[in-house]
C-alpha cells in the first residue's frame, strides 16, 4: 500500500511540475518585459520546489504510517462473533 501511495504522490508532484512549466511558458510568451519573464521563471522554480517538498513529505508520512501500523498491530485480521472473516 505504501508504494501505491508513494506513486500517487509522485504523480501528483509530476502534474504540479508540468502545470508550473506550462504556466511559465505562457507567461513568458505573453510579455516582452525581461523582468516579468524572470519573475515567471522564479515562480515556476518555487512551484517545482514546493511540489518536490510535498512529495518527499508525503513519502515520509507514508513510511511513518507503515512503521506505526507495524508496531501497533493495526491492520491485522481476525474473526468476528458470527465467524465471518473481518479486518480490524
UniProtKB/Swiss-Prot annotation:
Tissue expression remark: Accumulates in developing seeds and drought-stressed leaves.
Family: Belongs to the LEA type 1 family.
Induction: By abscisic acid (ABA).
Name of the protein in question: Protein LE25
InterPro entries in the cross-refs: LEA_1 (IPR005513)
Gene Ontology biological process terms from the UniProt entry: embryo development ending in seed dormancy
Region (Disordered): 1-88
Comp. bias regions, Basic and acidic residues: 14-65
Signal peptide limits: none
Domain of life, per lineage: Eukaryota
Pfam families tied to this protein: LEA_1 (PF03760)
